[in-house]
Amino acid sequence: MWRRLAFVVSNAAVLVLFPATSVPAAQSGTAEEAKAMLERAVAAVKKDKVKALDLFNTGDSRFRDRDLYVFCANVSDGVLTAHPTIRGKTLQDLEGKHGAEFGQEIMQEATEGMIKETTYWWPRAGSDQPLEKTTFYTKVGDQICGVGYYQK
């Protein structure tokens, strides 16, 4: 009995001294998860673009998870057709902190059938503190779609 009590007490001490050290990582999506979400998004756009854009914009759990989400823009004019907060703005006008013109880069470099990536500084939702973010993106028909993840 004393061994069991000692075990419980020592584990409780560990939890108090080192509370939930893995929680921040669990709150953020990973590179692998971002790329997998983009691949699901590409398949959805190819199957039914209108339905896919609706799913992206309504926050369907296959396309929005923690800080991962799908965004899409028209190839022709760069207007964002899917984004949680800035739908209707133009992709090429987006700049990260420190002047990185990542939106313009995405517009120029997106290629059908190839997933590319770009890194820039962008605040998390609800914050104005910029963090390093990498976005995977590709061209799908008349759309450019991407999913980004934060480095930390």
Question: What function would you assign to each model-found segment?
Answer:
Residues 2-152:
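N-terminal membrane-sensor/transducer module of prokaryotic signaling receptors
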